Design a protein with these regions (language model features):
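Solvent-exposed alpha-helical segments within well-ordered globular domains of core cellular machineries
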Residues: 3, 25, 44, 60-64, ...
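Walker A/P-loop phosphate-binding motif and the immediately C-terminal alpha-helix
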Residues: 3-40
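Residue-level signature of catalytic and energy-coupling elements of molecular machines
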Residues: 12, 17, 38, 46, ...
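Generic secondary-structure signature for well-ordered alpha-helical cores
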Residues: 29-32, 74, 109, 113, ...
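Short beta-strand "acidic-cap" motif of Rossmann-like dinucleotide-binding folds
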Residues: 33-38, 45, 115, 139
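P-loop/Walker-type NTP enzyme "switch/lid" segment
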Residues: 36-109, 206-208, 214
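Conserved catalytic-core segment of NTP-binding enzymes
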Residues: 102, 106-109, 113-208
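NTP-binding/hydrolysis catalytic cores, primarily Walker-type P-loop NTPases
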Residues: 212-259
Length: 259
């Protein structure tokens, strides 16, 4: 049976879309037929992170009734299938979110896992993305405002009958001003299923329009997301160790190599 999982955050700017994109690629590398759908029809970013901008048919066209969902599915990095939301303001004006459910029914028949990247906040489009799923992953940073918004999202999901798999803490740092894992689990009353470290490699990958787990599979964030993907489907994952050579050693080798 296809699993439909919405990735939501409540608060914007917590890295939800980056995690969704890379998680989709990770699940595909494990052999799962995975589709990632960008339901953030107003502020779409998924296609930029995956380097797939400029597609001719997008979710905008589907929700406006101008195209079928099958025409908006594209092959993405690592074999993941992607339904981009589109960035056209004209297309945004024509969409009807009540068409989302029927579009998702078609996608369910063609995938093992359907990941939905939900918009931030709790407006109509965000609620539609949450209600369309059977399960939900909450993404938050370990800061009070982010946790507060995640709690509101969790309450709405519970009312809609959506099963919350757990919380992903993103951009974790060793900072005493941040909430601890125990505190976050106590507030949200759901388990923390992954802790993603604050990693400068994320921004570098985004600048290249390439998923981090492909561009730099040895990075701490890549390993954490691959582990999250493995945990979701009951697979084993052996972290890829970074090169042990320090910066000085690499510099010396580079200089010697120029002789």
């Amino acid at each position: 049976m296809t699993r439909v999982i919405t990735v939501a955050s409540g608060k914007g700017g917590v890295g939800k879309t980056t995690i969704t994109a890379n998680l989709g690629v990770a699940l595909s590398t494990y052999g799962e037929e995975t589709i990632v759908l960008d339901a953030d029809v107003a502020m779409a970013n998924l296609e930029l992170i995956l380097g797939m901008e400029g597609k001719s048919v997008t979710l905008h066209d589907v929700l406006s009734g101008a195209a079928s969902i099958e025409d908006a599915i594209y092959e993405g990095p690592g074999g993941v299938k992607v339904v981009p939301a589109g960035i056209s303001l004209e297309g945004l004006r024509k969409i009807k979110m009540d068409r989302l459910e029927s579009a998702l029914e078609i996608l369910v028949d063609t995938s093992d896992i359907l990941l939905i990247d939900a918009p931030a906040g709790l407006e109509k489009d965000a609620l539609a993305a949450i209600a369309a799923a059977q399960e939900m992953i909450l993404v938050t940073t370990p800061e009070v405002p982010s946790i507060s918004d995640a709690l509101k999202t969790k309450i709405i999901a519970n009312k809609l009958g959506v099963d919350i798999i757990g919380v992903v803490i993103n951009r974790e740092q060793h900072d005493k001003t941040f909430l601890t894992i125990t505190e976050i689990e106590t507030i949200l009353e759901v388990p923390v299923i992954a802790v993603i470290p604050d990693d400068p490699e994320v921004s570098r990958a985004a600048a290249f329009g390439e998923p981090l787990i492909i561009k730099n599979p040895k990075s701490p964030t890549s390993n954490a997301i691959m582990q999250l993907g493995a945990d979701l489907i009951g697979e084993e994952y052996q972290p890829i160790e970074p090169d042990k050579k320090g910066v000085i050693s690499k510099l010396v080798e580079g200089l010697l190599g120029r002789r």
